[in-house]
C-alpha cells in the first residue's frame, strides 16, 4: 500500500489578466491600470521572508522577479542556459564546469562572478537540508568565470537540479544586509523596495542584464482567499490574479475584458498517509478503506469544474510516463471500504455513527492549508465521505509555514499539499522526496514510515543513469 493517495493530478494552472490595451478594465465599470509605471498582481503567498534558503521561500523569490538560477527550463522542460551560458562534464561524469555569463550584474551593480556563485551555492547547502536531498557535492571551486562542481556520485540531472529555485544565486559580497527582512540582492529584473507577507513592493532593476524591464514598479498584495482575489480583479484593484478558483472562472469569460492563461500543469495535489506504527492508518486495510471511500471523480467534476482530474499514480499525465494506461487499484468502492474496516476489527458498537475498537473511535487528523482553493475542498469532501463509512476526520487548517514542519516531524495522519512533480526537469527528485526511504533524515519530506527496497533500488539506478531512454524506462510507471 503506497503511503499517499493521489486525489488529483495535472491541475490546470489558471491566471487572469484584466486587459488594458483595449480600454476595458478589470470589472464592469473600473478600468485596469496597467501602465509602464505600475502593475499590480494578486497572489497567494506562504513566505514569511525572502531568504531563498529558508523553507520553500525561494519559489516566491523567483516568482516575484528577484532571483535567477544558473540554469532554466524551456517550454519542453529542457535545461537551457541562464546565468551560466554553457556547461560541460568530464569523462568520469563527476566534474561539471559551468561558465558564468560575463554580462550578468546584480541589482546593486556588482558583477556576477564564479566565486560569488560558489559562495551562494555553499550558503544554500549550509542552511537547507533540502539541498542535500537534491544532490551532493564533493567540492565547488571557482576558476576565473568557470564554476566547477565535483559531485560525490555521477549526477546526470545536475543542470536541471540547479534550475530549482532553491539554488537562486544571491550576492554574497553584501555582508550588512538582513536578507530575511530586506530580501537578497539578486540578478532578476526586479529588486525589493519593501516586503511583508501581506504585501511586496518591487522596483525595476536598473542594472538588469537580460533585456528591458516591463514595469518600473510592481505591487504584489497577498490575497489568499480565492473569492476575494477574484473580486479584487473584478473591481480593478489588481491587474493580474493567479490561481483563480474553478467556481470563479465563469466570471472572467468576457474576452474583451479579461485574458485567461490556462495550461496543463506539472503540479499534483497529494495527501500523504502516516503509516508509522501506532498511527490509526498503520493497518493496510484501514488505509485501503479510507482511499476507497473517497469519490474523487465527483470531487473533480463537481467541486472543481473539471479543472482537475482524479489521480491514480505519482506522476501526472502532463508528463509522459504512462498515466493513461494505468488502472486505479483503489477506485471508489464504499461498500468494499466498509468490508475492509470490519475485517480490520472496526465496528460501530455504540451507534454513534463511527466505527470503534477497544472502546476508541477510529479518528484521523487531516492537516491542510487554505492558500490553494482546492485543498480545503478536498479536505471537507474527505471528511464527509469518510463519515459515511464510520471514520471520523478532524480538520486542521494551518499556515503553510506550520504545515511543512508538521510534515517533516510526522505530526499528522493525513496531510495534503500542492506539489510540483518535475522541479528538476523530470520526476526524479519529487519521487525521491515522497517515496524513497528516509534514512537518517535523508528524505525529510517522507516522514510517513513508507519504505520500499525495490523503489530505492530503482531510484539508485536512476540517479546515475545518463541515457535518456533508460531514464524514461526507469521512471515509467
Describe the role of every protein-language-model region:
Residues 85-127, 148, 280:
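Aromatic- and charge-enriched surface segment that lines or borders ligand/interaction sites
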Residues 206-251, 392-394, 399:
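Ligand-site clamp/hinge motif
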Residues 392-403, 432-475:
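Extracytoplasmic/peripheral linker and loop segments enriched in polar/acidic and small residues
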